[in-house]
């Protein structure tokens, strides 16, 4: 399959360095009345929601004694109809024959186990990232619970879920060192593709998931140990909080190029997130009096 045409266009009409339409909103309709902060984020057809509970006092008294800062726990999930495989499974469930039905049941169980294992891995990643990004020293002997779910998965679901979590933290008033943004990129047909969709993810190319800060790093802040640095262009420098390479092996130059592409895309997506934050703050300020 040709992922990039001769004209330099992808299957959905985008250029290699273009991301899909993104939309950021606060207060998702599912948990806005029961949580301290909630948000939803959409990247193309990929849609994710997130909720934040806390910070609150730790439930375990024995754990309070040894806990110096905020403990962050994450829970990630995905709906049964989020992926295209689930839709195909529903369509095949109407076929006749006990053999086909047993095969469909086995396939459904296997897919469920894979999704559950993948969600647990994503939750562990988010816990490590948020522990670094949040100022945990302000909340000693406390805990914070983050819940996120992917409603529709059309590629780059992990980046969409993380951006929803960042917005939910802002809605809950949890202090972070900066506004963070995540983006995915892959390499297919010798081209570096930003914000890969579901079709490009199934191309089994090298994929990079990157979380970076949105502000430029100042010279006097270089001693602040939070992550690595990447020059986006000649005038800006971003701090990389976390990145992960999956899907195979490639050269260091390729990985560096994919990370730079992710940081450049995160810079554009963060502008949409900041617009949503400003609207949220103005709304809260108007309802205060």
Language-model segments: which ranges?
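Polyanion-binding surfaces on beta-sheet-dominated domains and ring/shell assemblies
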Residues: 1-289
């Amino acid at each position: 399959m040709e992922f990039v045409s001769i004209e330099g266009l992808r299957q959905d009409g985008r250029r290699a360095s273009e991301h899909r339409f993104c939309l950021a909103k606060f207060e998702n309709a599912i948990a806005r009345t029961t949580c301290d902060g909630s948000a939803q984020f959409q990247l193309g057809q990929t849609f994710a929601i997130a909720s934040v509970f806390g910070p609150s006092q730790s439930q375990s008294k024995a754990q309070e004694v040894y806990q110096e800062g905020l403990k962050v726990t994450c829970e990630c999930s995905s709906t049964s109809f989020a992926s295209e495989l689930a839709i195909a499974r529903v369509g095949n469930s109407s076929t006749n024959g006990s053999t086909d039905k047993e095969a469909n049941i086995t396939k459904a169980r296997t897919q469920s186990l894979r999704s559950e294992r993948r969600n647990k891995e994503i939750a562990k990643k988010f816990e490590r990232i948020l522990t670094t990004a949040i100022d945990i020293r302000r909340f000693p002997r406390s805990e914070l619970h983050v819940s996120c779910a992917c409603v529709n998965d059309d590629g780059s679901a992990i980046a969409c879920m993380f951006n929803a979590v960042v917005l939910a933290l802002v809605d809950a008033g949890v202090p972070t060192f900066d506004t963070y943004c995540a983006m995915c990129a892959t390499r297919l047909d010798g081209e570096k593709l930003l914000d890969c969709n579901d079709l490009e993810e199934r191309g089994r190319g090298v994929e990079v998931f990157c979380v970076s800060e949105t502000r430029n790093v100042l010279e006097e802040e270089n001693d602040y140990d939070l992550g690595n640095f990447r020059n986006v262009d000649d005038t800006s420098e971003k701090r990389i909080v976390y990145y992960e390479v999956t899907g195979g092996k490639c050269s260091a130059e390729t990985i560096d190029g994919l990370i730079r592409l992710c940081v450049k895309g995160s810079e554009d997506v963060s502008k949409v997130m900041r617009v949503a934050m400003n609207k949220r703050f103005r709304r809260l300020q108007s309802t205060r009096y």
